[in-house]
Amino acid sequence: MVEKVLSRSVRLIFAGGMVVGAAVQPALADDVQKVEITGSSLKRVDAETALPVQVVTKAEIAKTGVTSTQDLLATISAVSAGGSTTNAAGAGNSTGGLSSISLRGIGDSRTLVLVNGRRLAPFASGGGTVVNVNSIPLAAIERVEVLKDGASGIYGSDAMAGVVNFILTKNYEGVELSGGLGTPTASGGGQNGHASIVAGFNSDSGLSGVVSASYEQDKVLFGRDRSYAKSANNPPYYGSGATGQGNIQGPWTPGGGDDQATGGSGWGNPLAASGQCNTIGMTLYPGLSSKKQKYCAYDSGPDVGLLPDRKLINLTGSLTYKLNANAELFAEGLYSQSKVTTTYQASPARSDFFDPDVLFDGTATQKGTDRALLIYPNNPAYQSIAVPYLQSIGKSSFIGQPLAITARVQDFGPRQNVDTADQYRFIVGTRGTIANQDYEVAYATNQSKLNSAVTTGYFSQFAYAKAINDPNSNWNPWAPGGVQNPALAAQIQAAKFSGDYLSATSKSDTFDAKISGDAFKLGDSTSQYAVGLQSTRQNYALNPSSAYLNGDIAGLGGTVVPLDRSRNINSIFAELNVPIAKTLDGNLSVRSDRYNDVGNTTNYKANLRWQPVKEVLLRTSYGTGFRAPTLNDLWYPQSKGTSGQFDDNGPHGTGQTGIQIGNEITGGNPNLKPEKSKQFSMGAVLQPSSNFSVGADFFRIRISDYISTPTEQEIVDGYRRGDPAYQGLVTVDASNNIMSIIATTQNAGTADVQGVDLFVNFRQSLKDYGKLEINLNGTQMLKFDQTSPGGQLFNKVGTLVNNINGTNTAVIGANNGGVILRWKHMLSGTWTYGNWATTLVQNYASGYQTKDRMDGQPNFVGASQIYDLNLAYKGIKNAVFSVGVKNLFDKQPDTFIPVSNQFQSGYDIYQYDPRGRFVYVNATYKFK
């Protein structure tokens, strides 16, 4: 069989999907063999598919200069920041080391991640919802196949947006050593180092195997190391509203409760009134409190990590034993351990943050202290500082009463979390051929385990409050530098907390079997079929320490309750490929999944591939999909805790920003339904000549019963604009301050996503001057419309806000990842001359609108063009050396204003690498 020109072309297109210039040669006729392509259960000659699959090879990965699997995926145009999690996101708000992928921006839980065609256990952090892509070793990746189309008809749940399949090295003989170092050219942290070994063998006895081991390390980078991130205050763009030291919440009756106590800014701060916030390490907030007073806020910018300290160890192995020409046994193993240390600002403390802490339950007499930090009239600081201030703002009626005060507790230093995540997968099975039918049977066991600990910056709220609230403590919240008297300082230190506070485990055990082969003849052509079954048991367990269970550890966000739930999933699937005519193929797949907790679902996919002439390929597909709610979505017990930050500066709001409250109800919902989707795509591939090809694919994804946990900002915005769906989720006090929020998981509206993927590939021999390759891969988002639970429509392409009733309101989902870019592409050119190869890459991202500035004016981030350069040399036998620069011209970020929930300041953590210009050297040597 001789491949047609277009078949070779499409192989080049797929294999060069990124593309960064690796020369991918078409196979000769004798090399053609049937393989399984992501998106199908059938084995066929590669590239004979109606589905848009992009393939990134090992050689191409080397030319990008990426240092992690997360960074590699970010170069793919179909991958969106929307709905994903990154290392940078975890640096300022611990995610346990999770890095995830979101195709089309519809969320990482709607993109299926596979390794060698099978699932990994979801990451134990964040509810066991998504796969941590950094547990997949970059050094062991042979290629990445990205199916840019829904595939629930083949794979079941989660494949709404598409599938990312990591194929690890399997057939290798010899030993390969590689390593590299990289550093930003700017001072500070952010350095990277990595080393790996891959070894493989093939024996005459039929036994073959490959093992790999790798180590990666990233150094921490802080906000103080970058000019654009060193402060959370940058008027008129943004200002820090984080809880400051010494703000007066209001009078407090000991043993009773608050009289006129408010949130974190309420009646202002004596030092703010005199312009002396800096004496206690705070800053003057550029606005007024809900009580129209000046107050001090905490500038978290310098202390927040932009990138965490990360250490990653990966081990992989595969073993195959040929029983005979038609059967073999196989085994695969994967182990990964990541240790991520995140460091950020000191913990805040105030009365509403103590609300979830069960140690304060009961009266103060019963428990020994009040649910607030109090300063008493007999305190010298009360008389010398508080009294004159209260008189000056017309609140002499407060004098003589204890006052509730806010604190930014510097006594224990900055907060530091250490998250250790272990992931393993082990597979055993057999495959072969019986009567010309291919079969495969396998058992896989998967586990992701997370252990979270704290080292500094954390303390028992109850013990701290008890020390402060001693009427004889003489606590001075306005003391210069925060220095307290020695006796009180010693008592405070006894409240320190360190050690493990949470462990979580996500497990799955799966048995699967399938058979495929030729079905029946249609003229001169043969149809193909595949049928199979799968049985999976999933388990998710969450085990907090007693202190975390009580909600008593300051800075961890309130109570976390135990969870241990399991479920069974049984599935059957089938696929049929029919050659309808000489140039027209049709494919139909169907899968039925039975869950013992959310019911049954059946999904299908149909596609057509038409090649009227050898230079033209037309393709289209239509299918349905679903996503089952996770065990955490369904069963996580509802509990009260501290909210994330949000703003209340819209119509009918208080005007405050950076608010946190201590009375937020979160948790699962056992009444959730599975999400449903419908997907459609159609595209064309053209190759007018052997060295030029171009293609485009239109896609549309419609999702109903969208599962989400609305953010505080979404809820507050909906409540303030009068959306009926949010009115029961918020309570306010007599002064209109938000006092409580209910943010449980729900089926919340719909989404309609449309766009076009485009690629162009060109290769040209320069004769005596080598050869030139130019490749473009881009994605144009045409539409991303999502409705809120109340039916409010949000248009999300190119913006984080929509104008609703004259006010720019955060789009739904804006807090859960980054913006949906209108256009994103990677354009690369490689010139190869002798033993040298030079690659220049342009990474382009269109501009977008952010949250409004503090003065109410709109803010925009401009289009970004970041260039990377790589120079490789292979003139030494079995060795390759490369040097490179990422962000060649050291482009600095435009000023970014987040909707909320981003501790880092000044830049978009999902779009910009704060390392800036980054230089690296890599080397690889093969022993054969």
Residue locations for each model-derived region?
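N-terminal periplasmic accessory domains that precede
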Residues: 69-72, 99-102, 132-134, 158-179, ...
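C-terminal beta-signal and adjacent terminal beta-strands/loops
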Residues: 459, 782-783, 843-851, 872-928
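C-terminal beta-barrel architecture of Gram-negative outer-membrane proteins
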Residues: 641, 772-874, 889-890
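N-terminal periplasmic "start-of-domain" segments of outer-membrane beta-barrel proteins
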Residues: 34-67, 123
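Short loop/turn motifs that connect adjacent beta-strands in outer-membrane beta-barrel proteins
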Residues: 171-174, 204-206, 324-327, 433-438, ...
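Extracytoplasmic beta-strand/coil segments of soluble accessory domains associated
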Residues: 74-119
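Surface-exposed, low-complexity loop segments enriched in small/polar and acidic residues
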Residues: 128, 227-234, 274-310, 316, ...
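Short acidic/polar hinge/loop motifs at secondary-structure boundaries
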Residues: 118-148
